[in-house]
Amino acid sequence: MKFVISRNELGNLIKKVQNVVPQSTPIPVLTHVLIESCNDELVFTATDLTVSTRCVVKAKVYESGSVTIPSRRFFQLIRELTEANIEVAANSGEMATITSGSSCFRLLSMGKEDFPMLPDMQNALRFTLDSEQLKDMFQRTSFAVSREESRYVLTGVLLSISNGTMTVVGTDGKRLAKIDTNISLDPSFSGDYIIPIKAVEEIIRMASEDVQSTIFLDQTKIAVECGNTLLVTKLLSGEFPDFSPVISTQSSVQLNLHREELISLLKQVALFTNESSHSVKFSFSPGELTLTANCTKVGEGKVSMAVNYTGETLEIAFNPFFFLDILKHSRDELVQLGISDSYNPGIITDSTRSLFVIMPMRLHDD
């Protein structure tokens, strides 16, 4: 195998697959990237056996072939080189030669036969979606997934299809983010797919490369193809909790809140929360919202803003950082907050097809 490619393009190519490569694994070849060259094309593949990615680019191929190279060391080397073009050559599965100007390096390598094959998704059900829209849907929901491995199913993002609508949901049980869109699939088709957060984060990175993304659906896998990059991931097994009772909660009070002002006030008052509980009291009185937090070790913070509230005094407590996350992922300056009492969740919406839920906290004084 022998090819020549520009340093910048090679660096970008490795960067696209680098995040999939596991930092530590009992299977040495998984720390490698598979490089295949043929017909003036290079194919780079990386996998951790759950998430796999493949990138294809044009290059000057002098000899077809394949080799696997330690990914991180290769990436680090390419970043340090200064010449415009780089030559990579390999005659066996034991050593790859990297030449840049007068510099020459040899990296221990392995053969293609040791590298896991990328799952075949060509016969899977597929549909297309605007890449920026796909990226936006995952960005606005993935922040809410659980980071606790003990809550296995909640560490992924749900992609649900029903009646020609694709719904994406992330939740950790304390907050929930949901967004949906119409897709070009038979309305009779339905299915639920729980995508690992690592795969979701990679899809977000790659989804701005092309106008359209193609999504492939299989019972145990899902794939996304965007531009010259294909990502295939196994799905998380298990049943995603039924969230319909929470999002269908009828709120007796509907309020319009100015997002930027509320973000600023929440950041201020959050400095006075207890590190173990992080609770801010929202007190609604006619025409005003007052935010209060106090901590015996810090002190007390109290701020207020004008709101379109006309009822009796209503108090509810929320985690300010969860509330801030939701506000930061809203697209409008004016958001709607629906509440009923101190015990039921708050429902936050804007003019888009998104909905956020935040569970209340116990009202108390520290």
From Swiss-Prot:
A Pfam family matched in the record: DNA_pol3_beta_2
Annotated GO biological process: DNA strand elongation involved in DNA replication
Record organism: Chlamydia muridarum (strain MoPn / Nigg)
GO cellular component, one term: cytoplasm
Primary localization class, coarse: cytoplasm
Subcellular location: Cytoplasm
Summary of the function given for this chain in its UniProt record: Confers DNA tethering and processivity to DNA polymerases and other proteins. Acts as a clamp, forming a ring around DNA (a reaction catalyzed by the clamp-loading complex) which diffuses in an ATP-independent manner freely and bidirectionally along dsDNA. Initially characterized for its ability to contact the catalytic subunit of DNA polymerase III (Pol III), a complex, multichain enzyme responsible for most of the replicative synthesis in bacteria; Pol III exhibits 3'-5' exonuclease proofreading activity.
Alphabetical list of InterPro entries matching this protein: DNA_clamp_sf, DNA_polIII_beta, DNA_polIII_beta_C, DNA_polIII_beta_cen, DNA_polIII_beta_N
Assembly mode: Forms a ring-shaped head-to-tail homodimer around DNA which binds and tethers DNA polymerases and other proteins to the DNA. The DNA replisome complex has a single clamp-loading complex (3 tau and 1 each of delta, delta', psi and chi subunits) which binds 3 Pol III cores (1 core on the leading strand and 2 on the lagging strand) each with a beta sliding clamp dimer. Additional proteins in the replisome are other copies of gamma, psi and chi, Ssb, DNA helicase and RNA primase.
Keywords: Cytoplasm, DNA replication, DNA-binding, DNA-directed DNA polymerase, Nucleotidyltransferase, Transferase
Upper lineage: Bacteria, Pseudomonadati, Chlamydiota, Chlamydiia, Chlamydiales
Domain of life, source organism: Bacteria
Family: Belongs to the beta sliding clamp family.
GO MF entries: 3'-5' exonuclease activity; DNA binding; DNA-directed DNA polymerase activity
Designated name of the protein: Beta sliding clamp
SUPFAM superfamilies to which the protein is assigned, alphabetical: DNA clamp
